Structures are given as structure tokens and as C-alpha cells.
């Protein structure tokens, strides 16, 4: 990392009860499972020697719990931003994948298989999510030029951003690598206002 680059570390939250149950989460409340808490603590142990100039998190309970378990001694340093929340899914939130697949197959199919076509009343589409994720991460990167920041957010949020800066299309958003719980991504932001990926879902590039 040169002095002109911002190093951005993006983390997905730990496993939640709704992950286990197979529910659409969005901005509704779900909480970490015991496994999810352990994942966050293990991640925190791996990061213990890395100094972050700023730590940001989505204010959702699952990301808040993840951030607190990663940095238990820095709870007062974590800043929670509404712009980092997961894709808003409207009436799908809290519903089982299996129920939506059976009763609203088009929405299910578009979300998982044709994300560029996904459109549900009261929900964000993936273009809107991509614009939101890119805008806030660019802003936070510019605020810490030459520094290192951490962002705890959500699977679709991070995937939308990574897909965009990797110059891929929205329809490719769910292509591998899969964004596992507590996945660690690293991106560099340079003085020319461009991003480059150095780690994607735990895989170094």
C-alpha cells in the first residue's frame, strides 16, 4: 500500500438465524447464531495486529453484533451508517426462500438467477443497490486517503460493489466466489479515484 492509496477491508456479517432458516433478510432484524458469534471472534483474532484508522458498520443487528465481536475493545470507535445496510427487499423480507419460490417464483428466480431483472414493489433493485454501495464506499475511501478502513456489511451489498469494480454486469452478481459469512475482502482506492481488488471473498488476487 502506497501513501496515496486507501486500503478498504470489507466484511460480511457472521451466520444468522435467518441464514440457517433460509429466509430473505434485507433490512429486517435477524441475529447471529452461536456459530456466527464464533466466526466473528475468530475473524477478530486474525485481525488483531491490523490497525484500522476508521471502522464502519451497517446499523443492522447482525452487522452490529459482528463488529462488536471482531473489535470488542473498540466498540466506541465503530461508526454505524445507514448507507451500509443490506438491499431492501420489501415484502420478501422475513419470508422463507422455499415459500417465495413456490408462491412468487418470478421474484425468486429474478433475485437468484436474473438479478438484472429483479423488481419488487417497495424493494431496491440491484442497480440502485450498486449505486448506493459504490457511492458510500467511494466517500469513505476519500475521507481516509492513505489510511486503512474496515466496513462490516452484507452479502448482496458487498457483492454488488465488488461486481461493479470488477467491471462485471449485474446479471453476474451471484457468480463465484461466494460471499460466505465473515468473508474478508480487500480493495485499494487510489488517487485517480479507481478501485482495485486484492482479496475477494477470502481469495487473494
Task: Give residue spans per PLM region.
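Generic beta-sheet signal
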Residues: 8, 147-156
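Loop-to-helix element that buttresses phosphate recognition and phosphoryl-transfer chemistry
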Residues: 9, 15-66, 120-134
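Active-site metal-binding loops of divalent metal-dependent hydrolases
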Residues: 14, 155, 203
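Short, basic/glycine-rich phosphate-binding loops at helix/coil junctions
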Residues: 20-23, 106-120
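Phosphate-coordination/substrate-recognition cap region in phosphate-metabolizing enzymes
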Residues: 44-109
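Glycine-rich phosphate-binding loop signature in dinucleotide/nucleotide-binding domains
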Residues: 49-51, 140-147
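GST superfamily/GST-like fold recognition
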Residues: 155-159, 196
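Domain-level recognition of soluble alpha/beta enzyme cores
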Residues: 169-194
